[in-house]
Amino acid sequence: SISKGHNCNGININKGVKKTNALYVSDDPIFSMNRSQKAKILEILNAEARALDPRVVQVMAGLSCTHRTTLVMPTDNPSRYDIKPMVHLSVSVVMEKDGRREVGYASAGGAILLDELLKNNSLKDLAKEAVRIASVNMEAIPAPAGTMTVVLGAGWPGVLVHEAVGHGLEGDFNRTGSSAFTGKIGQKVASEACTIIDDGTIPN
């Protein structure tokens, strides 16, 4: 077995574990609060959302926590591990007026602990954003259709970059030569108007 011989088919994997600079805490968010404290967070979101606008008829809030450990064991370098806490809090509100119903949604979280959600009016701000979106949707009219120029801001439009560029940069696609970016390191692959920065160390 691997554990018995510290090798796999003759490949030595016993090279120790190298520590690098931590980008986030390694504590487990799952046990950072008890069940009643977690429920209280959802109760606060519910109360805040309903207090912001009398048209809010339903509030749905969710809280999830994970604590993931990843170990990378190359054959030619020291092993490295990543311990990442992940917290996700979301709230969705249903607003109704004159027979019309609209929904607003907002979420927060990241590689943080649960107590971060209670700082700086975070819960109230989250509820306020969900209610704001629902309110905007209540007054919304059908958007114009057809071909037009658009400007994408920061945030969710990043999903478009992920799909259009991110998957094409994956190692397997480039190894097999099936990516549009294969063999183009150092070459321009987009228009002059397009600049994409991928840096996992940028805060938030």
Segment roles from a protein language model:
Residues S1-P203:
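Active-site bordering "gate/hinge" segments
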